Amino acid sequence: MVLMFTLLPMYYSDNYYNILNDKRDVFWLFSRILFAVIAVSLCVSLILTIRKRECLKNMRVQLSKICALDVVMLIFAILAVISTAYSADIGNSLSGENAWDVGTQMIVCSVIVYFIISRCYSGKGDLWVYLYAGTAAVLTIGIIDRLGYDFLVMHDEIPLQYNIFISTIGNVNFWAGYLSMLIPFFMLAVLFTKNRFAKFFIYLFLLAAYFSLFITLTNTTYIGVGIATLFIVWYSLCDVKRLKNLAVNGILFAIAGGIAEFLWRNPCTPRPIDTDSVSRLLLEHHLYLLPGILGIVILVLLLLGAVCPEKIRTKADYFVEHMLSKFWIWLIMVGIIGAVFYIIYNYNLELFNFRGSIWYFSFMGFCDGTLWQKLMGVGPALLDTVTQAQIAKADFFVEWNWLYCTAHNDLLEYLVTMGVFGAACKFLMYIVPFVMYARGKERKPEKAAVLAALVGYIGQGLFTGPYILTYVFYIIFLGVMCAYDRMEKAKGAKA
């Protein structure tokens, strides 16, 4: 896990030309090391249990630890194998070569990694230090890159596409998926970090991360981080002590926006910064200041609350934690309904940078499929065979065929490639972590931070497809979430 968090995001061999295969190869290497270590440990454990004649007892203990998410993950892997076995192109379905390297091999391997992490992670916070180190390094390279200092000479042979490749990650959509998980995680990581020095560096990382939002040519990061922030706001409202951290994040966002606006209006770097539509809207109308103003208001109210009589403070805390938090849930529900109606009434093939056409051809391909394909899909990573057939059928002009290799929507991707059963499993992967969190008596910040990362993945998954690095991190967070749930159950059983 340490190697995956630190080295996997940074490794590349031939600039951006082979970066997907690079990430895949390194993941295979780290996975094999992990599998070998676990296999040896299991063999030693098995020998000891046989000697002590405790095989059946240990088997019962392990079976009792199986949870709903374990079952979903196992079924998902089995469905991927079956779908590939009956697909028209087994080789590409296995490798995922045509779909950002997330094929059946990756799915099965990641499920094994999930089971290892969910059983072996002990809850030690040292893991997050390595996550911070790897992410901070990649983020620093990305910011320097966006300002026009290509010190790694990554863009040397593709100057015309400078703005759509970044850092050691690759395409800006991959970058968006990566940060959509890690920014929300570190927004809450401060709450379980005791060392003030460490808190300072987390806030410094967040300042840099917010700055990167403004200067990168992608809106997807705003979507992923924004949706995760909805959960973070609710979590903060449930305990007024957490509001200070939320306020600081709002102020940091405003500061980052101010720096970005200065560089945007006064270009002084080798290359003018890139701004997508959301960044341009925030900078032109100074809307980035709103979170900062709200943060200052929250801090002032917290200071006033500290000097108020205890009776008034208790009433104010009750209002925030029991009434305002519930009102926020209702606001989210109204927002979801509004977003659905907006998409329905404004749907066209050019919607969201031609994602409308990708979604349309993907869904029509699903509808035109056989009963088997509707239930089990055409095979993981084979979406392009469906979309290209639909494009030819509609006689639709496509300038960039590679855009249609993935559905740019996680659920739709698996609906077409793994059928209704695969999409149902994927949907359950989204829902079960919320159930795990809700049923827990101790809603620790660590668990909330991991859930925030998973929500960020769901958010970015509305507009991007599965990408190997993002997918690996998502699986790791799922495994950690299951491990926290397992430890909480064990603690409750002892009590």
Language model regions located:
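Interfacial juxtamembrane loops and adjacent helix segments
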Residues: D150-I166, F174, G369-V416
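Aromatic-rich transmembrane-lumenal/periplasmic boundary elements in polytopic membrane proteins
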Residues: W100-D101, I141-M154, Y342-V386
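Membrane-interface interhelical loops and short amphipathic "cap" helices
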Residues: D14-V26, S87-N98, D150-T168, I223, ...
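Alpha-helical transmembrane segments and their immediate interhelical/interface regions
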Residues: N18-S31, I90-F115, L213-Y222, L324-A339, ...
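Hydrophobic alpha-helical transmembrane segments in multi-pass integral membrane proteins
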Residues: N21-I82, G292
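Membrane-interface catalytic loops of GT-C/OST-like multi-pass glycosylation enzymes that act
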Residues: L20-R24, L94-A99, V172-N173, L217-G224, ...
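Transmembrane helical bundles and short interhelical boundary loops of multi-pass, membrane-embedded
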Residues: M10-L29, I251-S357, S362, G465-I468, ...
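Alpha-helical transmembrane segments of multi-pass inner-membrane proteins
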Residues: M1-M4, L8-P9, R32-I47, A77, ...
